[in-house]
Amino acid sequence: MNSCFIILAGGESKRFNSNTPKPYTNYKGKPLLLHSIDKAKVFNKFNKIVLVVNKKHKNFIKKLNIKNIRIITGGKTRAESAYNALKSIKENNFKNVIIHDAARPNFSLKLLNKLMNELKLNDCVIPAIQTADTVKQKISNNVKNLKRENIYLIQTPQAFNYKKLFELQNNKSEEVTDDANLFVRAGKKIKIIKGETTNNKITINSDIKFNNLIKFGIGFDVHRLVPNKKLYLGGVKIPSPIGTLGHSDGDPVLHAVTDAILGACSMGDIGEKFSDKNKKFKNIRSTILLSEIIKQTLKKGYLINNLDINIITQKPKIQKYKKQILNCIAKICNISPTQINIKGKTTEKLGVIGKEKAIACEVIASVIKND
């Protein structure tokens, strides 16, 4: 579908009351805005992703090293930021545009899919949930009860026909709190779909809660060392006269990491996912296998919290390559290097590892369930 996903993260975060602006605050294992970016990428139906940021937050955005998305500066208000984003993609001739607030990191891919499907027959589609609370309107010193069945809490992402929305933005006479309001004021039809109660908005600092389910998994792998084979450890090619024997590239570190993550997520093991009886995986790089597992775990709502890795080998010594391995794994898993710890161990020349005939690795992974 010819579509663009816009993420608004250009606010001042005044109500959030923190030295770190809200979009860059750690939430469920990574900066808040990365949740929306990663979900948009995994959804894999957007031709372009646009991130709108506050010009005062350049140092924060630079540290994230975000790639393959367009980053632009927002305006003084949410409406201005949305308009800036729409203008920035005018030449792309997108049919549809999804606009989302970075402050809502908990939307699901299922909700995105519903929005895109409804957009085939509508120009404006928004998710909403009915309030379960009693709602009153204050009038002077009195209050008036409002009918709950008529009260909706509006959420993002919101989906639009790009051309229709851009026309309304160009002709607006006053500011609006969200883009759907432009359709309301113009008397245009709006399609409301059922939102998600978990798709809450992070507004103040106390909204950041780690009330998530943390799960753990253990991974272990060992490979024989033989002549005339390449040696890969943690995705890094290690200079060595001998290498690991395996159906794939024989990387014991990435295999153990993969199994630990699968175990933590209750998703089986690496042998079930990538059978050594399947010729398709013959000599395949383990970086590709781990990348696929990361995509699968993200779709199920799991985020990696921490990896603790023991690489057990007499030779080579791991210290020299530790930083390379750490950065490689962090990149594949889409986490910060600070969430990974790597330790090199020997067996004091005991057993097959001590005799330099094998290399082993054990990993403990912790993950957070993003419900």
UniProtKB/Swiss-Prot annotation:
The record marks 148, 201 as: Positions MEP for the nucleophilic attack. A divalent metal cation binds at residues 221, 223, 255. GO terms for molecular function: 2-C-methyl-D-erythritol 2,4-cyclodiphosphate synthase activity; 2-C-methyl-D-erythritol 4-phosphate cytidylyltransferase activity; metal ion binding. Its EC number is 2.7.7.60, 4.6.1.12. It catalyses: 2-C-methyl-D-erythritol 4-phosphate + CTP + H(+) = 4-CDP-2-C-methyl-D-erythritol + diphosphate; 4-CDP-2-C-methyl-D-erythritol 2-phosphate = 2-C-methyl-D-erythritol 2,4-cyclic diphosphate + CMP. The record marks 15, 22, 247, 346 as: Transition state stabilizer. Pathway: Isoprenoid biosynthesis; isopentenyl diphosphate biosynthesis via DXP pathway; isopentenyl diphosphate from 1-deoxy-D-xylulose 5-phosphate: step 2/6; Isoprenoid biosynthesis; isopentenyl diphosphate biosynthesis via DXP pathway; isopentenyl diphosphate from 1-deoxy-D-xylulose 5-phosphate: step 4/6. Residues 215-371 are annotated as: 2-C-methyl-D-erythritol 2,4-cyclodiphosphate synthase. Its cofactor is a divalent metal cation. Residues 1-214 are annotated as: 2-C-methyl-D-erythritol 4-phosphate cytidylyltransferase. Pfam families: IspD, YgbB. InterPro entries: IspD (IPR001228), IspD/F (IPR026596), IspD/TarI (IPR034683), ISPD_synthase_CS (IPR018294), MECDP_synthase (IPR003526), MECDP_synthase_CS (IPR020555), MECDP_synthase_sf (IPR036571), Nucleotide-diphossugar_trans (IPR029044). 4-CDP-2-C-methyl-D-erythritol 2-phosphate binds at residues 221-223, 247-248, 269-271, 274-278, 355. Keywords: Isoprene biosynthesis, Lyase, Metal-binding, Multifunctional enzyme, Nucleotidyltransferase, Transferase. GO terms for biological process: isopentenyl diphosphate biosynthetic process, methylerythritol 4-phosphate pathway; terpenoid biosynthetic process. Bifunctional enzyme that catalyzes the formation of 4-diphosphocytidyl-2-C-methyl-D-erythritol from CTP and 2-C-methyl-D-erythritol 4-phosphate (MEP) (IspD), and catalyzes the conversion of 4-diphosphocytidyl-2-C-methyl-D-erythritol 2-phosphate (CDP-ME2P) to 2-C-methyl-D-erythritol 2,4-cyclodiphosphate (ME-CPP) with a corresponding release of cytidine 5-monophosphate (CMP) (IspF). In the N-terminal section; belongs to the IspD/TarI cytidylyltransferase family. IspD subfamily. In the C-terminal section; belongs to the IspF family. PANTHER family: 2-C-METHYL-D-ERYTHRITOL 2,4-CYCLODIPHOSPHATE SYNTHASE, CHLOROPLASTIC (PTHR43181:SF1). This is Bifunctional enzyme IspD/IspF. It comes from Pelagibacter ubique (strain HTCC1062). The lineage of its organism: Bacteria, Pseudomonadati, Pseudomonadota, Alphaproteobacteria, Candidatus Pelagibacterales. The gene is ispDF.
